Design a protein with these regions (language model features):
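Soluble FAD-dependent oxygen oxidases
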Residues: 2-5, 13-526
Length: 526
């Protein structure tokens, strides 16, 4: 795997890297030993070692782009350096240096891994005084000769992927926003317009763990750099436990350098946005409940219902994002939604590239996301909005506040699609029945408002949970890619799945590099 590198690299008089890698796959780090530990210790810090080995692939603060991170909380952190590897071998070299450096000077070798930088909470994909491994140069989108799979690099954003696939009449179960990164969405699950048909963005052949309607369900192979620096493939035939774990297990096992995703033929389809005033809220709740729990759910249909508060006028509007992944206008499955009077309607026949750019939230503001999952219930839908109405008055003076609560159907058909595709590590099962996801996305300007916005929003979700318990509609699943820093999505996968993920971590990362030295994300042993 290191055929492009010399057997050793001379670093300022130090033989830093002795790249002799065993030919057999073994995950005992003692058998890897590709790096001279004493040499790394003498260099003094990881950024120096990385700069000497990877040279122009290492950058320092002051020359980094302003839009590296979506949220201001992430952008406010100051890494000591940023590594932008151009291929899997450079990722491997970086990880080997970070692995040894974390033993000798852990205070200077913590690291974070960045794909698109869309997770908003501080430290998710950035690190103070540490190293960011930025995957933006791993941006290949390569369609197989027979057009059944696509090799996608983690440094892509979904808009980049669709720009390649749409002209070929192809699609993958990818993200719905152009600016979201591929790597985090796939390894964390991933909702898609195509999920009712194909499952989540990443599923496996093991029924014990299932994705549902996420991006994780359709990944045939993960190319992964392990903590040892070894590069392996994880699929149904090789390292199948790692394959399953990566379908929802996030950044806990290694750095994925390529996803082989199943592709399928896809024509242009119907989608867009519909904005209505808040007087139609209850009618939309009835439509949402009926749609999500329909025994004849149309797998081509999806919709997201956003409840948006406008602080300046203390008024409400709704924003719908329906899609029907056939070239058909006004399908019956979505009629109860689309018949609601509106003052903005952009519904049209177009493609994923176009639709993914429609709803855009600019970087550079303070952001918060919180999520929960409940069994579908008209009483719960109404309770959510009632609690929301009681919460927002306290936030009226937060500067530049934007508030949106999204409701997303998660019918049992999606878990069934995941089961057909294989499974994953999310713990969802069609026996859970018809569910729906709740996502709060709120944006504001001034850091002084952080405690107010965060405390009120967190309290609101605690009230949601209490009401769900009263109504008997709870579900433990917390979608990792939407979760706030204080939530525990791994626990929501269930004890069996969490134990499985921990076992996989011990096998492929026995030192615990991705648990100890990479503090961002949701860890397995908390």
């Amino acid at each position: 795997m290191f055929k492009h590198w010399p057997s050793a690299i001379l670093l300022g008089g130090l033989w830093l890297l002795c790249l002799t890698v065993p030919g057999t796959a073994s995950f005992n780090e003692d058998t890897q030993a590709p790096i001279s530990e004493s040499a790394v210790a003498k260099v003094g810090n990881c950024c120096t070692a990385l700069s000497l080995v990877l040279q122009n692939s290492v950058q320092y603060p002051g020359i980094l782009p302003d839009d590296m991170y979506w949220s201001l909380q992430e952008a406010e952190l100051h890494p000591s350096c940023v590594v932008t590897p151009s291929n899997r071998d450079e990722v491997s070299l970086a990880i080997q240096i970070l692995h040894l450096g974390s033993k000798y000077f852990p205070d200077r070798c913590e690291f974070a891994v960045r794909s698109g930088g869309h997770t908003p909470w501080a430290g998710a994909a950035n690190v103070e005084a540490g190293v960011v491994v930025d995957l933006q140069r791993l941006n290949q989108v390569i369609i197989s000769a027979v057009k059944t799979t696509v090799n996608v690099g983690p440094g892509n954003r979904w808009g980049d992927v669709y720009n390649v696939l749409d002209p070929q009449g192809l699609a993958v179960t990818g993200g719905r926003l152009a600016t979201v990164g591929v790597g985090g969405l796939v390894t964390g699950g991933g909702f898609s317009h195509f999920s009712p048909r194909y499952g989540l963005v990443n599923t496996t052949q093991h029924r014990i763990i299932e994705c549902g309607k996420f991006a994780c369900d359709t990944v045939d192979n993960f190319e992964v750099v392990l903590a040892s620096g070894q590069i392996v493939n994880a699929n149904a035939r090789s390292n199948s436990d790692l394959w399953r774990a990566l379908r929802g297990g996030s950044n806990n096992f290694g750095i994925v350098t390529a996803f082989t995703m199943r592709s399928f033929s896809q024509s242009d389809y119907w989608g867009g946005s519909i904005i209505s005033d808040g007087t139609h809220m209850d009618k939309l709740f009835r439509a949402f409940e009926s749609f999500t729990s329909s025994p004849t759910y149309d797998p081509y249909a999806t919709n997201i219902l956003n409840l948006i508060w406008q602080p300046a006028t203390d008024s409400w509007i709704t924003l719908q994002s329906p899609s029907y992944t056939k070239k058909q206008v006004g399908p019956p499955a979505l009629e109860k939604f689309t018949s609601v009077p509106s003052f903005v309607n952009t519904m049209r026949i177009s493609n994923s590239s176009d639709f993914s750019k429609e709803l855009y939230s600019a970087p550079g503001q303070r952001q918060l996301m919180i999520t929960a999952t409940f069994q579908i219930s008209m009483a719960m839908l109404r309770a959510i909005h009632t609690i929301e109405l009681q919460t927002v008055p306290a936030l009226r003076n937060a500067s530049g506040l934007q508030w949106s609560l999204a409701l997303q159907p998660q019918p049992a058909i999606i878990s069934q699609a995941s089961a057909r595709a294989g499974g994953n590590s999310l713990g969802l099962d069609d026996s859970d029945g018809d569910l729906f996801n709740v996502l709060l996305t709120t944006t504001w300007v001034d850091k002084k408002d952080d405690p107010l916005v965060e405390s009120q929003s967190r309290r609101m979700f605690e009230q949601f949970q209490a009401e769900a318990e009263r109504l008997g509609v709870t579900n433990p699943y917390v979608y990792l890619n939407y979760a706030a820093s204080w939530q525990d999505p791994i626990r929501g996968y269930g004890d069996v799945n969490k134990a499985f993920l921990q076992d996989v971590s011990r096998k492929y990362d026995p030192y615990g590099l991705f648990q100890k030295a990479a503090p961002g994300g949701f860890k397995l042993f908390n």
